[in-house]
Every structure is written in C-alpha cells, then in structure tokens.
C-alpha cells in the first residue's frame, strides 16, 4: 500500500511517501516571511498553492512512480493556520477525487510523535513534543495520548522565534539564538513560570526583550533565554518521568534539533535510568513523511473519509484523538529490533 502524505499546517508545504509502513522519502519547500516579520497565513497559503504541483511531480519522479500508484492520501487536518491548512486539504481532496482513492485526516502533532516513535524504535515512551506550535509532555493511556503538561500560552519554538525576530536574528529563531548564545560570557537570572506541570513562555520572551532594550549584551540575553526555556522543560519532564515510570523518553518536533537541549535531556535520562531517544533531524520539522506514516497506520485501523466529508481544524487538541493503531507500531518496533539483533 502506497500512501501519500500532505503537510501544510504552517510555513512548510511537504509531501511524503510511505510504502507498506516504510518511509520512501519526502520533499518540501518552506515559506520565508519578510525579514523582521512573522508568518502571514494568507501569504503562506499562496506559497503552498504555487509549490504544491511542482513538489508533487518532483517527488513522484524521484521515486519512479506515477500518480496512479497511490492507494491512499493522508493530509494534515490540523491544528495549524487556517489558510495554509485549507490549501493542503484542497490539494488532497482534488487528488483523491481524480485518483478515486480514500482520504485519511491526520493530527499534525500526533504525526510528529509517530514518526519519532518509528525512527527511534520506541514503543511506549514518555513524549516531549516541542516545536513552533507545540510544547507538551504526553504518554499513551487508555486509547489516547494523555497530556502530563503543556504550555499555557505560546509554544517554546514560537517564543524563541518571536525574540529572534524582534532583535534581528532572523528565522528560524532557535538555531539563530543558540548561535548568538555561544559568545556569551555569563548568564543572568530569568523568571521561569511553571504552574504544576504547565509552562508559560510568553513572559520569558517579554523579559528577554526588556533586558536587551536595557543594554544587556545580546549574546548574554540569548544564552540566558535558552537556558531558562530548556530547564523549564527539563523540570516538568523529570516530574512526568517520576509519575509515569516510563523507561523511554522520546523527543519530537523541530526544537528537538537543539544540541543544547539534547544535552540537558540526556542528563535527565542518566539521572532516571531512562533511554533518551531524539527524532532524526530530517524528520524533526514539519514533513510529509510523518503525515503519510501516521495515515498508513490509521488507514489500516479503518480511519478514512471522503472528499465531501473531509475537514480541517485550526484548533485540535492532541488528547481528543483516538489512537487505535498505537500497538501496531509497537509490534513493528519489536519486529525490526529483533531482526537487527539476529546474527
């Protein structure tokens, strides 16, 4: 079964292919907003509509397949930017009608988790999902991912991106801020807001800008900002590990590329005797492969829709989605691991 995945939730339009549960490849292009500005949803949508047919042709040609080979189309139905989501959905619907194949709506955040589980050979981990649009800790229980802590306002990636934009470091903000932080000679105290297991990052950005405008050297502000942001994550992750007793920690989402954060989380893993597994860089950001992979498992469990009944949801909580395929992926992990261990 060949599944095409369509990702268009924010600044990236990407298509991915999965054949019988194996990722074949992906291809995408990212909308870059004007310098000093955030994402303009309608401009991102215009970008996606222009690049979609080009990426589709290039992806098929790269793998020597034709459109008629596609059996299922999975698309990111949310959460995300409304105009951008609709472009991906329209593309998926039109192609499904033309090819006469079913559609599978996929939750973008769950797709991040599933591709991380798949690529790190993890079965039942505690998950830290961190990106421009997500900051949460989750674990599987009773048919769904249950959230053990999340941001109360903006996601960590968005918070750092906003700071980077305001101080002229460009987009994406996380690598730019971390690069700037390398030349810092000290740290300054930052307020860290943790309420129970939940986090607040909006105030962190505001405080960082206040420090910078008051004359604190930019590298010092950058270093202090990322250290505070990451140690907030580490604290709530430690608590969740202690509560859930999970033996694996999987880190998913674009911010998982951060080498500094990896070091902090690996230290947490050593303290708790937990294996820390981080999604490979190529699947950390938004990508069509994660949509295709999740769509593949969902379709096998009977989840599908028609073009007429397909939908998009700008706001869609991760813990509202049933995951009937959860242990199917576990079986795949066990099979692959045991195969690799054979002499």
Swiss-Prot record:
One of its GO terms (molecular function) is N(6)-L-threonylcarbamoyladenine synthase activity. It is found in: Cytoplasm. One of its GO terms (biological process) is tRNA threonylcarbamoyladenosine modification. Fe cation binds at residues 108, 112, 286. GO terms for cellular component: cytoplasm; EKC/KEOPS complex. Its main location: cytoplasm. It catalyses: L-threonylcarbamoyladenylate + adenosine(37) in tRNA = N(6)-L-threonylcarbamoyladenosine(37) in tRNA + AMP + H(+). Its cofactor is Fe(2+). It is an enzyme of class 2 (transferase). Substrate binds at residues 129-133, 161, 178, 258. Its EC number is 2.3.1.234. Binds 1 Fe(2+) ion per subunit. InterPro entries: ATPase_NBD, Gcp-like_dom, KAE1/TsaD, Kae1_archaea_euk, Peptidase_M22_CS. Keywords: Acyltransferase, Cytoplasm, Iron, Metal-binding, Transferase, tRNA processing. Belongs to the KAE1 / TsaD family. Required for the formation of a threonylcarbamoyl group on adenosine at position 37 (t(6)A37) in tRNAs that read codons beginning with adenine. Is probably involved in the transfer of the threonylcarbamoyl moiety of threonylcarbamoyl-AMP (TC-AMP) to the N6 group of A37. This is tRNA N6-adenosine threonylcarbamoyltransferase. It comes from Pyrobaculum aerophilum (strain ATCC 51768 / DSM 7523 / JCM 9630 / CIP 104966 / NBRC 100827 / IM2). The gene is kae1.
């Amino acid at each position: 079964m060949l599944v095409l995945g369509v990702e268009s939730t924010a600044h990236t339009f990407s298509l991915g292919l999965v054949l019988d549960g194996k990722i074949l490849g992906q291809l995408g292009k990212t909308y870059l907003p004007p310098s000093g500005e955030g994402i303009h949803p309608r401009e991102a949508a215009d970008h996606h509509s222009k690049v979609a047919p080009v990426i589709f042709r290039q992806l098929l040609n790269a793998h020597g397949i034709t459109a008629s080979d596609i059996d299922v189309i999975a698309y990111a139905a949310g959460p995300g930017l409304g105009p951008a989501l609709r472009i991906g959905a329209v593309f998926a619907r039109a192609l499904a009608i033309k090819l006469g194949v079913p559609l599978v709506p996929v939750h973008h955040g769950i797709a991040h988790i599933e591709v991380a589980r798949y690529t790190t050979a993890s079965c039942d981990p505690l998950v830290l999902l961190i990106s421009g649009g997500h900051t949460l800790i989750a674990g599987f229980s009773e048919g769904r991912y249950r959230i053990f802590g999340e941001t109360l306002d903006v996601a960590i990636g968005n918070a750092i991106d906003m700071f980077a934009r305001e101080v002229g470091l460009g987009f994406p903000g996380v690598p730019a801020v971390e690069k700037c932080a390398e030349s810092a000679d000290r740290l300054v105290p930052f307020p860290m807001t943790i309420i129970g297991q939940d986090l607040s990052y909006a105030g962190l950005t505001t405080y960082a800008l206040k420090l910078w405008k008051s004359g604190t050297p930019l590298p010092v502000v950058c270093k202090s900002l990322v250290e505070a942001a990451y140690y907030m994550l580490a604290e709530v992750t430690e608590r969740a590990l202690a509560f859930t007793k999970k033996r694996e920690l999987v880190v998913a989402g674009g911010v998982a590329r951060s080498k500094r954060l990896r070091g902090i989380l690996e230290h947490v893993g050593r303290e708790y005797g937990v294996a820390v597994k981080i999604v490979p860089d190529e699947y950390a950001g938004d990508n069509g492969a994660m949509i295709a992979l999740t769509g593949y498992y969902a379709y096998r469990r009977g989840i599908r829709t028609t073009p007429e009944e397909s939908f998009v949801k700008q706001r869609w909580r991760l813990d509202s989605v049933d995951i009937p395929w959860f242990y199917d992926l576990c079986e795949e992990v066990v099979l692959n691991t045991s195969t690799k261990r054979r002499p």
